[in-house]
Amino acid sequence: MARCCRHLAVFLCVLLMLSLCKALSSNVDDGYGHEDGSFESDSLLKLNNDDVLSLISSDETTLEASTVSVSNFGAKGDGKTDDTQAFKKAWKKACSTNGVTTFLVPKGKTYLLKSTRFRGPCKSLRNFQILGTLSASTKRSDYKDKNHWLILEDVNNLSIDGGSTGIINGNGKTWWQNSCKIDKSKPCTKAPTALTLYNLKNLNVKNLRVKNAQQIQISIEKCNKVEVSNVEITAPGDSPNTDGIHITNTQNIRVSNSDIGTGDDCISIEDGTQNLQIFDLTCGPGHGISIGSLGDDNSKAYVSGINVDGAKFSESDNGVRIKTYQGGSGTAKNIKFQNIRMENVKNPIIIDQDYCDKDKCEDQESAVQVKNVVYKNISGTSATDVAITLNCSEKYPCQGIVLENVKIKGGTASCKNANVKNQGTVSPKCS
């Protein structure tokens, strides 16, 4: 009997410790994710990030995985019926379901949507599968929010997967025709971003096609730990402001194996972007990869840790560009562009610290400091007489600019207020 009592006591202690671990994992991040760093209780028990994720995962696997399809909530998918409310109902169900959950947009159908917000936090939503087509309403009156069409926000540990068949179609022609950049007689008004990803952690976007956005195609804002791979983004070369991927206030991003051709920047990188890795990108038509514009309206801007390794630019207005306004402040630093091919690009390499997108900009002394920028193993042809432009600030000259094995045919170099070091074969050279 005594032995049985001892065994029972040990068993109860184990149960108590497991309960304590589960309680601690709940305190880390309310059960919806985890933060960087480790958690230490007042007791002798210590949990690191891997321990917390393990506890959460083991808790989820005890519940049955489920799929929530928009078809089960009344979505027709005929391309004509407004499916907005059906999507909202399906999202509410998926977001509140326990266990690993998938929000499913079925293959082979086209779902007409007005402006729609998919908001978290969610209990255990892990997959957003877009296997069919999301098609934007062409009625401008259907957009109460003129800045956004689809918004996904406040959801952690999520995969957005197009399965190579999923399409997001912004049907932007109506908006382009009414743009002041196309018709100077019309007032300049706002237009929606097709897909806004806001305040997300541990996000994976893959195997997705986005086309013909009303304005920006994909905007990544205030996110951390983002992976984008195998995406195709397209819009006509004359479509206004249709940036492919716009990144701001986001850290730890990787974009790889993607093809982007639009009427604006293939990738635009703005204030607050840190540790961005871009691999194996094809760009064109478009305005290339642009860091900036930074420092508009005399603002402070900070961008650092940008690495572009492996890219091809074809018939684009720019290749790799850094652009800042006069009057701004801050830094754009620790930037590397390498292993890049230019084919008939108008401005293959350009730093422009006198950028102005208005009729007239006043001369100002202050500027964003550009420093520690490396251009390595870049070759190809320029479509203009100037292949390399380094137009830096007089008061805050560009520092630590390195050109290594850069060979661009068909143009000269124009360099002003730039501290440049040449390594290997460089042509054309700054005089």
UniProtKB/Swiss-Prot annotation:
<feature type="active site" description="Proton donor">
    <location>
        <position position="264"/>
    </location>
</feature>
<feature type="repeat" description="PbH1 2">
    <location>
        <begin position="250"/>
        <end position="271"/>
    </location>
</feature>
<protein>
    <recommendedName>
        <fullName>Polygalacturonase ADPG1</fullName>
        <ecNumber>3.2.1.15</ecNumber>
    </recommendedName>
</protein>
<dbReference type="GO" id="GO:0005576">
    <property type="term" value="C:extracellular region"/>
</dbReference>
<dbReference type="InterPro" id="IPR006626">
    <property type="entry name" value="PbH1"/>
</dbReference>
<keyword id="KW-0964">Secreted</keyword>
<dbReference type="GO" id="GO:0010047">
    <property type="term" value="P:fruit dehiscence"/>
</dbReference>
<dbReference type="InterPro" id="IPR000743">
    <property type="entry name" value="Glyco_hydro_28"/>
</dbReference>
<dbReference type="GO" id="GO:0005975">
    <property type="term" value="P:carbohydrate metabolic process"/>
</dbReference>
<keyword id="KW-0326">Glycosidase</keyword>
<dbReference type="GO" id="GO:0009830">
    <property type="term" value="P:cell wall modification involved in abscission"/>
</dbReference>
<feature type="repeat" description="PbH1 1">
    <location>
        <begin position="223"/>
        <end position="249"/>
    </location>
</feature>
<dbReference type="InterPro" id="IPR012334">
    <property type="entry name" value="Pectin_lyas_fold"/>
</dbReference>
<comment type="function">
    <text>Polygalacturonase involved in cell separation in the final stages of pod shatter and in anther dehiscence. Not involved in floral organ abscission.</text>
</comment>
<keyword id="KW-0378">Hydrolase</keyword>
<keyword id="KW-0963">Cytoplasm</keyword>
<feature type="active site">
    <location>
        <position position="287"/>
    </location>
</feature>
<dbReference type="GO" id="GO:0004650">
    <property type="term" value="F:polygalacturonase activity"/>
</dbReference>
<feature type="repeat" description="PbH1 4">
    <location>
        <begin position="332"/>
        <end position="353"/>
    </location>
</feature>
<comment type="similarity">
    <text>Belongs to the glycosyl hydrolase 28 family.</text>
</comment>
<feature type="repeat" description="PbH1 5">
    <location>
        <begin position="398"/>
        <end position="420"/>
    </location>
</feature>
<feature type="signal peptide">
    <location>
        <begin position="1"/>
        <end position="23"/>
    </location>
</feature>
<keyword id="KW-0961">Cell wall biogenesis/degradation</keyword>
<dbReference type="InterPro" id="IPR011050">
    <property type="entry name" value="Pectin_lyase_fold/virulence"/>
</dbReference>
<keyword id="KW-0677">Repeat</keyword>
<feature type="repeat" description="PbH1 3">
    <location>
        <begin position="303"/>
        <end position="324"/>
    </location>
</feature>
<dbReference type="GO" id="GO:0009901">
    <property type="term" value="P:anther dehiscence"/>
</dbReference>
<dbReference type="GO" id="GO:0005737">
    <property type="term" value="C:cytoplasm"/>
</dbReference>
<keyword id="KW-0134">Cell wall</keyword>
<keyword id="KW-0732">Signal</keyword>
<dbReference type="Pfam" id="PF00295">
    <property type="entry name" value="Glyco_hydro_28"/>
</dbReference>
